[in-house]
């Protein structure tokens, strides 16, 4: 079972995420690589919204393959190309939509660029299930 710590005495999170998650003796852990916005046919959508959908739908497929759900995600690391930092609300909205109200520990970092110039974002998650 995973649950958020309230962070007594700390500032509230800046968005819909948890400051820390405790996993009570998980029997299985899933660590993804950075998931990038490449569709199964090898294309990369142009818009940030479409890239976020590709990334998060890929993460959901991996969770399903591991017999897990979004509620099992304990940590999210998101990288967004700095030139597109004005689209962070789009990235965060996609995350929230795919998590369905679940809050995980989350770090969002802007970077000068990713490996391929058409990639605008990349997400890695850790999930724990009992």
Model-predicted regions and their roles:
Residues 1-74, 80-130:
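N-terminal presequence-like segments and the immediate start of the first folded domain
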